[in-house]
UniProtKB/Swiss-Prot annotation:
Its cofactor is Mn(2+). Binds 2 manganese ions per subunit. It is an enzyme of class 3 (hydrolase). Mn(2+) 2 binds at D103, N135, H185, H259. It comes from Neurospora crassa (strain ATCC 24698 / 74-OR23-1A / CBS 708.71 / DSM 1257 / FGSC 987). This is Serine/threonine-protein phosphatase PP2A catalytic subunit. GO terms for cellular component: cytosol. PANTHER family: SERINE/THREONINE-PROTEIN PHOSPHATASE PP2A-RELATED (PTHR45619). The active site is at H136 (proton donor).
Length: 327
């Protein structure tokens, strides 16, 4: 079959919304300005935004190529004001190229504003920002951990939740920086040996309960060798022998991932084959951790920038208490 592996896993062009008028740059800039001030968009504007974003994302690969320099970020989890701090530390978009590794929603109080802003930036500067899918970019998880309830509270119905969760199906699963640094939300899978295995996946679906797509968003590195059962109930744990072999076989120097709270914002593991980056400081407004982002320059040299929570007077009360289990 004469198919380029780069194109496998993409959505056919005929699925593009044909009756959608392209959003003008002044309109987008107005939306972004409003969102930067933590003001939510009207429901109809969110619908237009998500339709346009789908057109952009459906052309991206399951292993989206990214060029240096770029700044790599971990979980945000609706902590909007800390995202503003991240941009203050790392530079504004599009002055800085960004790669976000998923988990934009749930837990924090401003999931709506956070994910809307990142999606708007993606449409406005598609070659300057890459947004990957995390395990929380899912219909099932967001109904339990806050995003669904927040949408109901802020819009009075579930339409905005549906627009975004439908869009999440189009997010790339992984990214590859200059063919050397492999970025994804969770970790490796026993079903995947090569990047071409990932390119061959059909990603346009809800995150499955098991299988390679699930594993990429749920797995974690572990001190024990080989594959292990994950305490999360999805994905696997994988040892240094697994990450070393994967990096060697695919010509990689590093796996960068998010998904786990690390107290200093970043953490090397598995003899520096893997680095975990977490970008939500004082996670859930109580964990006391620092956050970090990883700056990669044009020579593939990386620097970690750590930051603390943005000072703020207080946060609004949430309508229900979310479960304690940290996903």
């Amino acid at each position: 079959m004469d198919t380029n592996m780069e194109d496998v896993g993409r959505v056919p062009a005929e699925l593009t919304s044909s009756n959608f008028e392209p959003t003008t740059i002044p309109t987008l800039d107005g939306w972004i300005e409003s969102l930067m001030n933590c003001k939510q968009l009207a429901e109809s504007d969110v619908q237009r935004l998500c339709e346009k974003a789908r057109e952009v994302l459906q052309d991206e690969s399951n292993v989206q190529p990214v060029k240096c320099p770029v700044t790599v970020c971990g979980d945000i989890h609706g902590q909007f004001h800390d995202l503003m701090e991240l941009f203050k530390i790392g530079g504004s978009c599009p002055d800085t190229n960004y790669l976000f590794m998923g988990d934009y929603v749930d837990r924090g109080y401003y999931s709506v504003e956070t994910v809307t802003l990142l999606v708007a930036l993606k449409i406005r500067y598609p070659n300057r920002i890459t947004i990957l899918r995390g395990n929380h970019e899912s219909r099932q998880i967001t109904q339990v951990y806050g995003f669904y309830d927040e949408c109901l509270r802020k819009y009075g119905n579930a339409n905005v939740w549906k627009y975004f969760t439908d869009l999440f199906d189009y997010l790339p699963l992984t990214a590859l920086i200059d063919n050397q640094i492999f970025c994804l939300h969770g970790g490796l899978s026993p079903s995947i040996d090569t990047l071409d295995n990932i390119r061959a996946l059909d990603r346009i679906q809800e995150v499955p309960h098991e299988g390679p797509m699930c594993d990429l968003l749920w797995s974690d590195p572990d001190d024990r060798c080989g594959w292990g059962i994950s305490p999360r109930g999805a994905g696997y744990t994988f040892g240094q022998d697994i990450s070393e072999a994967f990096n060697h076989n695919n010509g990689l120097t590093l796996i960068a991932r998010a998904h786990q709270l690390v107290m200093e914002g970043y953490n090397w593991s598995q003899d520096r084959n893997v680095v975990t980056i977490f970008s939500a400081p004082n996670y859930c407004y109580r964990c006391g951790n620092q956050a970090a982002i990883m700056e990669i320059d044009e020579h593939l040299k990386y620097t970690f920038l750590q930051f603390d929570p943005c000072p703020r007077a207080g946060e609004p009360m949430v309508s229900r208490r979310t479960p304690d289990y940290f996903l």
